[in-house]
Regions:
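Hydrophobic, aromatic-enriched alpha-helical segments typical of multi-pass transmembrane helices
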Residues: 1-207
């Protein structure tokens, strides 16, 4: 399977997972409200979706790195490093939550808690940085411009969300949620279309 084909399928899968996560989150907010903690079974569904999306996001960024021209591969490499940290952190948090924490008879991440802080660091800072560094890979016009702008917006919103836990106001963190739960699935759909339309793309040499 070519890098573009792999990128297309993984980006499409990320978009669909994002829709599923957003729908689940909407249900959670309608049931529990914005301030109340989300509990099982809705929380368990969200954690499983997160565990699936973490390695998929690594595949998406890897495909972006493969797509980059030679003089822009450094951006793809930096993005890949940041997304790998993100995936490891969030996977560890949710694996522990789904196994050890529940076997102790408890569940849920309520702020402030160490596990929740690690989770927000992963999704806000490290995912946000990965998206921001992935954006310069797409230097062209047309579809590439749309992907570049989407990555910049999503990444900036994710990073901005770190202000919430930093100041202890979790309503401010909703900016980050909008970045990765709403904007990112749209960007992944644009990525899937770009990779699909450019199956014969070969990494270009530096100008």
């Amino acid at each position: 399977m070519s890098a573009n084909r792999l990128g297309s399928w993984s980006a499409l899968a990320m978009s669909l997972l994002g829709v599923a996560y957003f729908v689940t989150l909407t249900i959670a907010v309608s049931v529990h409200g914005i301030t109340a903690p989300i509990v099982d079974p809705i929380l368990a569904v969200m954690e499983v979706l997160t565990l699936i999306s973490a390695p998929l996001m690594v595949v998406v960024i890897s495909a972006i790195h493969a797509y980059a021209s030679a003089d822009r591969k450094i951006y793809g490499l930096i993005a890949l490093a940041f997304v790998s940290v993100f995936a490891a952190m969030t996977s560890a948090v949710h694996f522990v939550e789904l196994t050890a924490v529940r076997q102790r008879g408890s569940s849920g991440m309520i702020w402030p808690s160490p596990a929740y802080a690690v989770e927000l660091l992963a999704w806000n800072l490290f995912l946000g940085l990965a998206l921001l560094f992935a954006a310069p890979v797409f230097a062209g016009s047309g579809p590439e411009r749309g992907v570049r702008r989407g990555l910049l917006i999503s990444g900036a919103l994710c990073v901005a969300g770190i202000v919430g836990p930093a100041v202890g106001n979790m309503r401010l963190q909703l900016v980050g949620v909008f970045g990765y739960a709403v904007v990112l699935p749209v960007v992944c759909l644009l990525l899937a279309r770009l990779f699909r339309s450019d199956r014969n793309h070969v990494s270009r040499p530096a100008a």
